[in-house]
């Protein structure tokens, strides 16, 4: 050992004297800065120990190899373990170099360890993320009879915070307060951190406010805690207080505040913070990454790329944020290009990056790219990660290939399947395969795999059958999962969805502590089935219960006022939000705009819209829709133009709204302008936008443009297929409509009620009576869809156009549901065409009984009677019409 020590020291050009001085300096430095040791003041070093320690710790000498050489030299000189200062210094060097095993061996050789040496071990374990070992050593320290000091408590509380061990944290925190160490800065910051991570932000905030001299680290810890607890208001308030006070924000502060702006998509305030960052010169990689994340989450990818390009050496987080931003913006090809550049840059890719690029490929038009990414994932070994496997399952599900999703799931081992079974159940749900979801859940139980509240909630979200829902309900009662708040909420949502509102309300009442999500879900359930009074009453019950409604609950109540237009109720809710001071949120603002638009109060809707803190496509869409419904097409287009001119990229929902407005206008040029904008931003391939384009051109009478719009859609969905069928039907092209319908079925799509309206309408317009009967029967027999009055209207129209009026009457009388006024009105119109007076009288009488305020039935009957010269009855009909207060709408011309 002596030879080894001499040789090594000579090669490093370190003399024994220098070694002793170095270790002594280390000891003095650590004692003065970290351990508050009384012995540190007694050291009489002939040189500046701070400068010497800093020089050596920043050099190549501060590593494991050097530390072992120094230990060998000190052993040769018999200085270990008898020299306490040198032993502690060497212990600290082992800790700093990351070799805690060697540090533990050295600690065991110390004849009389003290609190300082114990602190070195506890801090070392914590520093190298060996948090459980840090807690064990803290317990060992008490077992050895040493009394912990502020350094001990600060380190062990930080370890508890990282482990998220609430019980042990509680014990240590109580003991810290009892021993009177809570006022030390190192303990205060650790307490703030542990309370924040254990969802006790109020306690963390109290510790912070009680602090006599909070440093920047304490400020950053409380701001990060507020961010972690999604208390964004506290983040901004603390940041403002910090800026006007004596503490100067650093890069960590700016990163936290920018993250809060990104979460709320507060671009305007984020730009203010960015300006302050530039002014202070705090643009490091962490802050720039936070700025990139802000722009990406707000949909401003050009600005995000500009900031990203200025980062000298982007980290893996920086690359991943850019990739995720393009994915969120539906720009999959840019996301793949970023991923390609990232691989060439040499940055180490992590599982978050991989899941982001996989998510970008989750669309029917990117099957080839999805396969290539999957192959790379398999080759690189990332497929062993559960989160990556879950992303692959979701990707194939969204691409429309649920079989490949299932294959990925089956290729996993039991542990991985346990972790992501919820993802598979959700994928089955999105692919409308509830049977497979139920079988998978049953298999989990049979194989002994653990089921939790997430598995049950995923399954309940799939079900639309009350009997199966009751079976799952029974399982939750047996397993005790029914006590979980999310499971209880999912159960009563299922009952509500299946039309069993009474059972749903019973379950709702059985939940002891209802959160806002429960109240909002029950209110939405009442709203869905038209129970306006009950929904509003439930909101009043919530207030009486002492629960303060959040934005989601208030938005649900406003949706009730929108679905069943009730302007007075809506104004009352708006007044409540103003009094409560919660009227500034984007979600609530959008709900208010939608409510006022649906209730016809467009002036108030525009006032709320103009006061929104940020431009919002959802609110814009609601207002455009309101303008369109009330004939203010030009106002809708002006609003759309203002949004585009401001540089805001409209989403598919806003585009669909303006296309519906264009379809209601008489100017095809407006629709063409919108189409040009859609082509420019690349949304023509989106199914929802393509369907709206198709419908617009159909109303303009351009069937060729309808076909072009359909051909541009990447992976047309059922809505797009149905829109094309309806377009052909509207233009009397029955054969083409039926060909599209058959092609749709060949592609694997199952028709719904709306699809059959288009099919039956095509048959009626083409006079295809037998085909109408066939498809009406197919609805029930092949797809289990019960026909509604709108389907029967098409059937009566087909019979009426073919002159089979008595058969149409017999068909109406044998309907499984009560015919409405439109059914009888359709027969009446056919009687007018074929001059069938007596049957026309019967049809008119039925239609007037059902809709006495509809002028159409009176006018049609009057015209039939006039054509056969029965003027007395014409006069009687007109008197009846006048007596009921019905007036014919006057004609108008745009010429």
From Swiss-Prot:
Keywords: Chloroplast, Plastid, Repeat, Transit peptide. Residues 1-71 form a transit peptide. One of its GO terms (molecular function) is RNA binding. Pfam families: E_motif, PPR, PPR_2. GO terms for biological process: mitochondrial mRNA modification. SUPFAM superfamilies: TPR-like. This is Pentatricopeptide repeat-containing protein At1g74600, chloroplastic. It comes from Arabidopsis thaliana. The gene is PCMP-E69.
């Amino acid at each position: 050992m002596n030879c080894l020590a001499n040789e090594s020291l000579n090669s490093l050009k370190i003399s024994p004297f220098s070694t002793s001085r170095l270790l002594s300096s280390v000891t003095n430095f650590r004692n003065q800065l970290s351990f508050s040791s009384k012995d540190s003041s007694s050291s009489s070093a002939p040189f500046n120990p701070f400068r010497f320690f800093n020089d050596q710790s920043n050099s190549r000498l501060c590593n494991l190899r050097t530390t072992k050489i120094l230990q060998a030299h000190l052993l040769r000189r018999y200085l270990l373990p008898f020299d306490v200062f040198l032993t502690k210094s060497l212990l600290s060097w082992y800790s700093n170099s990351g070799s805690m095993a060697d540090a533990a061996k050295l600690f065991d050789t110390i004849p009389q360890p003290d609190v300082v040496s114990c602190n070195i071990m506890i801090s070392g374990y914590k520093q190298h993320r060996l948090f459980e070992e840090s807690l064990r050593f803290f317990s060992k320290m008490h077992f050895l009879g040493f009394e912990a000091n502020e350094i001990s408590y600060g380190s062990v509380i930080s370890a508890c915070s990282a482990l998220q061990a609430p019980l042990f944290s509680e014990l240590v925190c109580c003991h810290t307060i009892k021993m009177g160490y809570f006022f030390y800065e190192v303990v205060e910051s650790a307490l703030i951190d542990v309370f924040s991570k254990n969802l006790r932000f109020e306690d963390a905030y109290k510790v912070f406010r009680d602090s006599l001299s909070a440093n920047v680290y304490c400020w950053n810890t409380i701001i990060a805690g507020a961010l972690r607890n999604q208390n964004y208001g506290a983040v901004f308030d603390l940041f403002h207080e910090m800026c006007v006070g004596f503490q100067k924000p650093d890069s960590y502060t700016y990163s936290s505040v920018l993250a809060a702006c990104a979460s709320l998509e507060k671009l305007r305030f984020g730009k203010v913070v960015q300006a302050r960052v530039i002014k202070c010169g705090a643009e490091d990689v962490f802050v720039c990454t936070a700025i990139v994340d802000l722009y990406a989450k707000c949909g401003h990818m050009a600005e995000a790329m500009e900031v990203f390009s200025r980062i000298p050496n982007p980290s893996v987080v920086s690359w991943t944020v850019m990739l995720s931003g393009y994915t969120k913006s539906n720009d999959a090809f840019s996301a793949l290009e970023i991923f390609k550049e990232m691989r060439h840059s040499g940055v180490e890719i992590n599982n978050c990056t991989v899941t982001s690029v996989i998510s970008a490929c989750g669309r029917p038009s990117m099957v080839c790219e999805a396969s290539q990414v999957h192959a790379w994932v398999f080759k690189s070994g990332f497929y062993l990660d559960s989160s990556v496997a879950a992303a692959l399952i979701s990707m194939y599900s969204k691409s429309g290939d649920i079989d490949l999703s299932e294959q990925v799931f089956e290729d996993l081992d039991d542990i991985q399947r346990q972790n992501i079974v919820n993802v598979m159940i959700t994928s089955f749900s999105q692919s409308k395969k509830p049977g497979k979801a139920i079988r998978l859940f049953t298999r989990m139980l049979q194989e002994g795999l653990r089921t939790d509240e997430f598995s049950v909630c995923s399954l309940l979200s799939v079900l639309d059958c009350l009997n199966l829902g009751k079976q799952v309900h029974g399982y939750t009662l047996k397993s005790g999962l029914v006590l979980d708040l999310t499971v209880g909420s999912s159960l009563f949502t299922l009952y509500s969805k299946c039309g069993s509102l009474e059972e749903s309300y019973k379950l709702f009442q059985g939940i002891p502590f209802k959160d806002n999500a429960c109240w909002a879900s029950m209110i939405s359930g009442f709203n869905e089935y038209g129970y306006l009074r009950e929904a509003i009453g439930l909101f009043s019950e919530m207030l009486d219960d002492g629960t303060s409604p959040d934005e989601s609950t208030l938005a649900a109540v406003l949706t009730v006022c929108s679905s069943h237009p009730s302007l007075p109720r809506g104004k009352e809710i708006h007044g409540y939000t103003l009094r409560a001071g919660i009227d500034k949120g984007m979600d609530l603002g959008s709900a208010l705009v939608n409510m006022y638009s649906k209730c016809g109060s467009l002036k108030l809707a525009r006032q709320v819209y103009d006061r929104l803190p940020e431009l919002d496509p959802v609110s814009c869409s609601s207002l455009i829709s309101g303008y369109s419904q009330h004939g203010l097409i030009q106002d809708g287009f002006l609003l759309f133009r203002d949004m585009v001119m401001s540089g805001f990229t409209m989403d598919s929902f806003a585009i669909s709204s303006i296309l519906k407005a264009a379809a209601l206008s008489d100017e095809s040029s407006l629709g063409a302008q919108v189409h040009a904008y859609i082509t420019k931003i690349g949304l023509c391939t989106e199914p929802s936008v393509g369907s709206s384009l198709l419908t617009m051109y159909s109303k303009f009478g351009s069937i060729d443009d309808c076909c072009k719009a359909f051909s541009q859609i990447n992976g047309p969905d059922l809505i797009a297929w149905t829109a094309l069928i309806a377009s052909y039907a509207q233009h009397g092209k029955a054969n083409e409509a039926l060909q599209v319908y058959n092609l749709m079925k060949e592609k694997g799509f199952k028709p719904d009620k709306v699809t059959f309206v288009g099919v039956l309408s095509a048959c009626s317009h083409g006079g295809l009576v037998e085909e109408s009967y066939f498809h009406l029967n197919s609805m029930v027999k092949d797809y289990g869809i019960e026909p509604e009055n709108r389907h029967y209207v098409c059937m009566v129209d087909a019979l009426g156009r073919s002159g089979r009026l008595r058969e149409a009457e017999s068909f109406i009388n044998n309907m499984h549901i009560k015919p409405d006024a439109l059914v009888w009105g359709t027969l009446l119109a056919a009687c007018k065409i074929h001059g069938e007076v007596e049957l026309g009288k019967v049809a008119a009488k039925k239609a007037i009984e059902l809709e006495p305020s509809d002028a159409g039935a009176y006018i049609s009957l009057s015209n039939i009677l006039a054509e056969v010269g029965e003027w007395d009855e014409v006069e009687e009909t007109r008197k009846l019409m006048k007596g009921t207060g019905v007036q014919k709408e006057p004609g108008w011309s745009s010429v």
